[in-house]
Amino acid sequence: MSSIKIECVLPENCRCGESPVWEEASDSLLFVDIPAKKLCRWDSLTKQVQRVTMDAPVSSVALRQSGGYVATIGTKFCALNWEEQSAVVLATVDNDKKNNRFNDGKVDPAGRYFAGTMAEETAPAVLERHQGSLYSLFPDHHVKKYFDQVDISNGLDWSLDHKIFYYIDSLSYSVDAFDYDLQTGQISNRRSVYKLEKEEQIPDGMCIDAEGKLWVACYNGGRVIRLDPVTGKRLQTVKLPVDKTTSCCFGGKNYSEMYVTCARDGMDPEGLLRQPEAGGIFKITGLGVKGIAPYSYAG
């Protein structure tokens, strides 16, 4: 077993860092700071970080096949021109719910951008429940709604054979699976594949590795856990020096490194003294497993 190394590669002080995505073409990590309305790009070679501030909370970002990026900003799916620091609205959801915003999002293997909504929090993980929905933005910019009654729409990914969609609604304390139709984007037959244990706290962002196992960041649990979605067993726990771990992705050379985002919001001064790296970007090496490249939006 190789020895696992955890380091804070960027002391960013994110209020709520989220949605890490590796951009292979630029050796960069994209991520967002939701309440700060910031989209960030960290160059792993120069160690420089560029930040763009939007006019509403930015909750997820993804690569786009035609260049640039797509992001969920407020309740809008947007296309981003990084150089011009501008966003073009592609679609808007939840028009009837003024207190809602998007949360986590990710592109599926067919190039659709899946993302879900939630009510704005009054404090971390404190919010009006059942207000969210799960959507996807198709390449032709039409939006499909899958279901509503969501608390905090969160981590999502697809099995390596593209037949299963994995999804987290945080306050269900469960990682769920659906049958998934790659051609149509339909999902069906929801079931739970893992229920979190008490010390694991709240399931947040998620990614899949090259062996088809799931990695889940546990908010307030200070860890990422590796799950086998077939057996429902936890295979590994990696603890970080911060409690509010929010999301994870693979990146770096051959996708052999894991990047983890975290949050500072909701921590008291004593907690921040104890965890000075809270809000930073962490890199985990030596996991002995690789990830897969992120999919790009096809529209």
Curated annotation (Swiss-Prot):
**Its catalytic activity?**
D-glucono-1,5-lactone + H2O = D-gluconate + H(+)
EC number from the UniProt entry: 3.1.1.17
The UniProt annotation places a divalent metal cation binding at 18, 154, 204
Keyword list, A-Z: Calcium, Cytoplasm, Hydrolase, Metal-binding, Zinc
Name the Gene3D superfamilies for this protein: TolB, C-terminal domain
How many and how are cofactors bound here? Binds 1 divalent metal cation per subunit. Most active with Zn(2+) and Mn(2+) ions. The physiological cofactor is most likely Ca(2+) or Mg(2+).
Where does the record place the modification N6-succinyllysine?
144, 244, 253
> Where does the chain bind substrate?
101, 103, 121
Cross-referenced Pfam families: SGL
**Which cofactors, by name?**
Zn(2+); Mn(2+); Ca(2+); Mg(2+)
The disulfide bonds in this chain are: none
Q: Which InterPro entries match?
A: 6-blade_b-propeller_TolB-like, Regucalcin, SGL, SMP-30
The listed locations are:
Cytoplasm
One GO MF annotation is: zinc ion binding
Active-site residues are 204
One GO BP annotation of this record: regulation of calcium-mediated signaling
Spell out the GO cellular component terms annotated for this protein, sorted alphabetically and separated by semicolons: cytoplasm; nucleus
Q: Which SUPFAM superfamilies match?
A: Calcium-dependent phosphotriesterase (SSF63829)
What is its biological role?
Answer: Gluconolactonase with low activity towards other sugar lactones, including gulonolactone and galactonolactone. Can also hydrolyze diisopropyl phosphorofluoridate and phenylacetate (in vitro). Calcium-binding protein. Modulates Ca(2+) signaling, and Ca(2+)-dependent cellular processes and enzyme activities.
* Similarity field: Belongs to the SMP-30/CGR1 family.
Q: How does it assemble?
A: Monomer.
Protein's name according to its UniProt entry: Regucalcin
The protein's organism comes out as Macaca fascicularis (Crab-eating macaque)
Encoding gene, per UniProt annotation: RGN
